[in-house]
Amino acid sequence: MDLRSALEKTNIIKSYKLHFLIRYTTSRFEVKEPFLAYLHMARQKDKLLPKCITPPNKKADPFTNDVSSYFTHTHTHTPCSPSLVYTYVNTTEKSPSKSPKHKNILPFNFTK
């Protein structure tokens, strides 16, 4: 699926995620805009899962607990599939920003 087709589904994913946050959480959340990433499609023989993602513009990729990480652009990569990565961060409780419960990244695979 190309970038245009994936981005057309952004509003559907956004609406679903906002509904989920309103319906199933009791805390206030800052919901960040979704962005497209290319996730590695691992073969069974792969011992390690290489992260086939677009280059982040800051110190770490979005699969870490660094809430400031995000992508500058996307690119196609043959063994990878496009996914929309949605980030939301709990803004009420005061604990370390790198705490896993304050950073949730959910990939949505458009190839299925």
Swiss-Prot record:
Residues 93-112 are annotated as: Disordered. Transmembrane segments: none annotated. Pfam families: DUF468 (PF04318). Belongs to the UPF0320 family. Contained within a telomeric X element core sequence. This is Putative UPF0320 protein YEL074W. It comes from Saccharomyces cerevisiae (strain ATCC 204508 / S288c).
